[in-house]
């Protein structure tokens, strides 16, 4: 009887410890061929994004949301989730930096999530009614699809070691010597590589983050923002905001625009005006090998 009681006590303690550590039954999804194969898995996505909404397309999935991609990555590594939704370029960036990670290469509207171009594309956001939308649309239209793709490939490579010299001319650039038309204040997270990230030097064309000493922003969004500002004859200033504060920043006039890997969803279009998309991507799921 004493042995039974002791065994039960040990089992109870083990269960308590498992619960305290966020223990759960993990699901191996490494062989998933489509999102239907994720049934029963615990999948994360960033709060307030289409990624999170898209998880409702999977029957029986356990959905978890986190404030940013650093939290998602930490949750995956700790075992709190089996995977998390990201754009394909983000997956390439993350997995290139950590050989323990991989991703499920789903294709939108095929093996992957059902989504429109607006839901999986990224665009620049302006305050509702801004006449800048039409102007910037004309600039975006000048950028060929091949250039957009080449720039993203460069940013994935550059993001692996942001402060090291990148001895290659970027696919997208413009003369920024003329800034007679004022300042273009652009907000982004500066924490969503390869779209935008923070580094400690101005290497490879990084832009100083306003209000942050010795911190610089770089990435795909930064390159596009630099191009737009140069074509407008404006000086570019980059501001770092938490994701949930980006729209409020442009609504209040604290910044002029958002370039933050943000998709022009119906909900967001009720709050701000978007340009045409300057990049489109498949949604994939990052996992541990």
Regions found by a protein language model. Give the residues of each.
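Bacterial Sec-exported substrate-binding components of ABC uptake systems
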Residues: 26-35, 155-182
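Acidic, polar ligand-binding/catalytic clefts
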Residues: 25-38, 88-119, 230, 235-289
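Alpha-helical transmembrane segments
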Residues: 11-15
């Amino acid at each position: 009887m004493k042995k039974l009681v002791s065994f039960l006590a040990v089992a109870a303690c083990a269960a308590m410890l498992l619960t305290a550590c966020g223990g759960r039954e993990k699901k191996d999804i490494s062989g998933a061929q489509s999102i239907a194969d994720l049934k029963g898995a615990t999948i994360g996505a960033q709060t307030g994004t289409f990624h999170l909404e898209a998880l409702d397309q999977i029957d029986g999935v356990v959905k978890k949301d986190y404030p940013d991609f650093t939290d998602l990555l930490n949750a995956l590594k700790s075992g709190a989730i089996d995977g998390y939704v990201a754009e394909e370029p983000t997956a390439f960036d993350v997995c290139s930096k950590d050989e323990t990670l991989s991703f499920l290469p789903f294709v939108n509207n095929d093996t992957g999530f059902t989504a429109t171009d607006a839901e999986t594309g990224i665009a620049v956001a302006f305050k509702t009614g801004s006449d800048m939308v039409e102007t910037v649309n004309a600039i975006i239209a000048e950028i060929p699809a091949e250039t957009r793709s080449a720039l993203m490939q460069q940013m994935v490579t550059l993001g692996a070691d942001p402060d090291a010299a990148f001895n290659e001319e970027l696919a997208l650039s413009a003369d920024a010597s003329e800034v007679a038309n004022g300042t273009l204040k652009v907000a982004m997270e500066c924490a969503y590589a390869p779209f935008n990230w923070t580094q400690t030097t101005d290497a490879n064309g990084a832009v100083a983050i306003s209000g942050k000493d010795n911190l610089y922003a770089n990435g795909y969004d930064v390159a596009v923002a630099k191009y737009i500002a140069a074509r407008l004859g404006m000086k570019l200033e980059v501001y770092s905001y938490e994701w949930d504060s980006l729209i409020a920043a442009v609504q209040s006039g604290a910044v002029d625009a958002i370039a933050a890997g943000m998709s022009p969803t119906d909900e967001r279009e009720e709050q701000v005006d978007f340009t045409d998309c300057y990049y489109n991507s498949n949604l994939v799921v990052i996992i541990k090998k």
